[in-house]
């Protein structure tokens, strides 16, 4: 779908009775009916928010699981933070992302083919990584650049890749001190002037799952009582968003939150399904599966996510 106004497009997966054939999406091919008429499913919409520099098609496996249970799935391309247009280094995208989810719901509601088949008063949201940050925002979380600065001052070494990205790694060598100095200097230069806090909720959103969310910039008190049911997926070997500072910190602050699934052997890229091929360098170290992790576990995780939405969106058993 075209994005509302001049916004980025929204990729939509939906139930259809048409014949399936190979459809190329980015680096992989899915079996789908690319132009088939949508049919009525369970009447509910789930919005998937991709990670930084990502794309909707890396969540195709989850989308297909949801569609098989009757959901329509909308996946906005987050402006300035997707594979075709990636401008890292600022919080511009994070300030827009939750609103882009709301606009994706608007786009579906304005589509003459889809709108009559859906009730948009109870929408689900799933987000991974920066998409998990988006999900936490929609759950009522308040965040600020200054909390990011404070976190990285206190935990720069332990949470290096969250604070600096995947440009370089700490190696234990003599250059590490210089890398830390440069990182601190850049963090303060870019963010010291932004003293605001940010948030955005949408009354149509009724259930949220955040997988490996970036959570350190949040005031955890704002997530102690989410505005809607909130579930988390945790990845035990995540080196990009170290769980103790992110997903586990949310679970510790939020007694009502549910751990939808835990993958103790999984790295950060586990929830990219399919995983992009040919990842190397520091990015490959962050996203490629660590030894001992089996992707055979992922279909069950997808089913648990779908079950969480079904419980909280009022959907009966398929």
Could you tell me what each predicted segment is?
Residues 172-257:
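The feature captures the conserved acid-bearing segment of alpha/beta-hydrolase catalytic domains
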Residues 134-138, 219:
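Hydrolases whose catalytic domains are alpha/beta-hydrolase-1, hotdog thioesterase
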Residues 1-46:
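Domain-level recognition of soluble alpha/beta enzyme cores
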């Amino acid at each position: 779908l075209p994005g509302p106004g001049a916004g980025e497009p929204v990729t939509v997966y939906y139930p259809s009775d048409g014949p399936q054939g190979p459809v190329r999406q980015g680096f992989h091919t899915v079996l789908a009916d690319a132009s088939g008429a949508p049919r009525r499913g369970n009447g509910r919409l789930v919005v998937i928010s991709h990670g930084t520099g990502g794309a909707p098609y890396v969540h195709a496996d989850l989308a297909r699981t949801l569609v098989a249970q009757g959901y329509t799935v909308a996946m906005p391309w987050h402006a300035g933070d997707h594979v075709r247009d990636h401008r890292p280094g600022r919080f511009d995208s994070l300030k827009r992302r939750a609103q882009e989810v709301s606009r994706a719901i608007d786009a579906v509601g304005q589509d003459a083919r889809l709108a009559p088949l859906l009730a948009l008063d109870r929408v689900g949201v799933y987000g991974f990584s920066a998409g998990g940050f988006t999900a936490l925002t929609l759950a009522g979380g308040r965040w600020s650049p200054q909390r990011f600065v404070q976190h990285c001052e206190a935990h720069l070494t332990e949470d290096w890749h969250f604070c600096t990205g995947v440009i370089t790694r700490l190696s234990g060598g003599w250059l590490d001190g210089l890398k830390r100095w440069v990182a601190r200097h850049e963090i303060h230069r870019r963010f010291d002037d932004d003293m605001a806090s940010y948030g955005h909720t949408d009354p149509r959103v009724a259930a949220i799952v955040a997988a490996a969310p970036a959570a350190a910039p949040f005031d955890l008190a704002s997530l102690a009582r989410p505005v809607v049911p909130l579930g988390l997926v945790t990845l035990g070997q995540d080196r990009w968003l170290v769980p103790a500072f992110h997903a586990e910190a949310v679970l510790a602050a939020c007694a009502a939150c549910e751990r939808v699934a835990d993958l103790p052997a999984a790295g950060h890229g586990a929830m990219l399904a399919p995983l992009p091929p040919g990842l190397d360098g520091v990015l490959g170290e962050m996203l490629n599966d660590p030894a001992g992790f089996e992707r055979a576990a992922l279909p069950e995780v997808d089913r648990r996510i779908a079950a969480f939405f079904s419980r909280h969106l009022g959907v009966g058993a398929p």
